[in-house]
């Protein structure tokens, strides 16, 4: 084995020299240069500095503007709440432990950090799935005379929390476990060992099938059907320039959604799966650290893509930031009037508001 396994930890270094120490008790500077921990802490501080304001602003603006408090926007609020879970439950903890060079908060802290980081990430992931399904149902109308209402939105929210807990809670009760990973200053699911009594193998397979592959397939299916629906609508009005513009906007939006989903989660999932299927193989601490912390940046991508590109929300946000007056209101109003013909396509396909 090209690593050192101990009680509730796995350090990716062979302990031939005897320098490997528990990541709960000693700095791990023998793994990487201490400057790397400083850079990691600075990166987490940047995510907090950007992620908290943009997600908090999302909640505040929605509460302040009644027209944003619609069933279709509930899932976007859920997305912001999930991102705040990651900011407070994961990012602050990781920044603090990075400053010390090891997981100074101990085993209990590892469970708490791993749980909240996983919970926030899974809520965000399943929120995107529910959003994709909602867009598909509203735009493509597979169910005739269906109207998306408040009860459907609440059921969607409950579903995201149920699925997130189904992934984040089992390691707390003995089905797998949370251990320090990468540079040993943040915690995640144990992909690394086959420790007796934890059934890591079955949990990792369950997680990859139910909490990655299935969501990815659903997102691709729903947005693929949405693109087809928009193209069909545009083909029926080929003489309309505004409709063609709406088609391009929706195409760009969907591509950004899918690419962001893959950019955030595919590297982490791929590396985790490789480690799981090649347990005992040699890999460095940075090998898992980079994709893990890149996935955390989804707390910034999510509100920017799914909310800030919403024209109605952007209008309300500018109004809030400018103390009740939108200096671009007249310009946006004229632009909106010129796009009346395409509103049925763009409002139902691009913007969830």
UniProtKB/Swiss-Prot annotation:
What transmembrane ranges does the database entry give? Answer: 37-61, 74-96, 111-133, 153-173, 203-224, 253-274, 287-308
Any single GO molecular-function term of the entry would be: G protein-coupled photoreceptor activity
Lipidation annotated as S-palmitoyl cysteine: which positions? 322-323
Q: Which residues lie on this side of the membrane: Extracellular?
A: 1-36, 97-110, 174-202, 275-286
Which coarse location class applies to the principal site listed for this UniProt protein?
Answer: membrane
Q: Which Pfam families match?
A: 7tm_1, Rhodopsin_N
| Residue intervals on the Cytoplasmic side | 62-73, 134-152, 225-252, 309-353
Motif 'Ionic lock' involved in activated form stabilization: where in chain: 134-136
Q: Specify where the region named Disordered lies, as residue ranges.
A: 331-353
Site feature location: Plays an important role in the conformation switch to the active conformation: 113
Its keywords, alphabetically, are:
Cell projection, Chromophore, Disulfide bond, G-protein coupled receptor, Glycoprotein, Lipoprotein, Membrane, Palmitate, Phosphoprotein, Photoreceptor protein, Receptor, Retinal protein, Sensory transduction, Transducer, Transmembrane, Transmembrane helix, Vision
Q: Where is the composition biased (Low complexity)?
A: 334-353
Please give the InterPro entries that the UniProt record associates with this protein.
Answer: GPCR_opsins, GPCR_Rhodpsn, GPCR_Rhodpsn_7TM, Opsin, Retinal_BS, Rhodopsin, Rhodopsin_N
Residues with the modification N6-(retinylidene)lysine, per the entry, are: 296
- Subcellular localization, per the record? Membrane; Cell projection, Cilium, Photoreceptor outer segment
Disulphide bridges in this chain? Answer: 110-187
Instruction: Report the PROSITE patterns cross-referenced here.
Output: G_PROTEIN_RECEP_F1_1, G_PROTEIN_RECEP_F1_2, OPSIN
Annotated glycosylation sites: 2, 15, 200
Q: Name one GO cellular component term.
A: photoreceptor disc membrane
Q: Which GO terms describe its biological process?
A: absorption of visible light; G protein-coupled opsin signaling pathway; visual perception
The family this protein is said to belong to: Belongs to the G-protein coupled receptor 1 family. Opsin subfamily.
- Record-given protein name: Rhodopsin
Annotated source species: Sarpa salpa
């Amino acid at each position: 084995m090209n690593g050192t396994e101990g009680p509730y930890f796995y350090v990716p270094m062979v302990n031939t020299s005897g320098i490997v120490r528990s990541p709960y008790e000693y700095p791990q500077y023998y793994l990487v240069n201490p400057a790397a921990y400083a850079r990691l802490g600075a990166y987490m501080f940047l995510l907090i500095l950007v992620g908290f304001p943009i997600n908090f602003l999302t909640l505040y603006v929605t509460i302040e503007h009644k027209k944003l408090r619609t069933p279709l926007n509930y899932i976007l609020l859920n997305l912001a709440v999930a991102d705040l879970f990651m900011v407070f439950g994961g990012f602050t903890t990781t920044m603090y432990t990075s400053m010390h060079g090891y997981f100074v908060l101990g085993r209990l802290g590892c469970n708490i950090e791993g749980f909240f980081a996983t919970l926030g990430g899974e809520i965000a992931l399943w929120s995107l799935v529910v959003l994709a399904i909602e867009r598909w149902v509203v735009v493509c109308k597979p169910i005739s005379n269906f109207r998306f209402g408040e009860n459907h939105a609440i059921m969607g929210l409950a579903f995201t929390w149920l699925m997130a807990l189904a992934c984040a809670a089992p390691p707390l009760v003995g089905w797998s476990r949370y251990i320090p990973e990468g540079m040993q200053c943040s915690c995640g699911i144990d992909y690394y060992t086959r420790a007796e009594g934890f059934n890591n193998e079955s949990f990792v397979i369950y997680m990859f099938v139910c909490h990655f592959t299935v969501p990815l397939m659903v997102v691709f299916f729903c947005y693929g059907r949405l693109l087809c629906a928009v193209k069909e609508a545009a083909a029926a009005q080929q003489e309309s320039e505004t409709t063609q513009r709406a088609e391009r906007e929706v195409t760009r939006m969907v591509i950004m959604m899918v690419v962001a989903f893959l950019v955030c989660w595919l590297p982490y999932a791929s590396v985790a799966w490789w480690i799981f299927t090649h347990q005992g193989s040699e890999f460095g601490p940075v090998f898992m650290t980079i994709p893990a912390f890149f996935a955390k940046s989804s707390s910034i991508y999510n509100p920017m893509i799914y909310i800030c590109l919403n024209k109605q929300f952007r209008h309300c946000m500018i109004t809030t930031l400018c103390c009740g007056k939108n200096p671009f209101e007249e310009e946006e109003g004229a632009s909106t009037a010129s796009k009346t013909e395409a509103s049925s396509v763009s409002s139902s396909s691009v913007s969830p508001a």
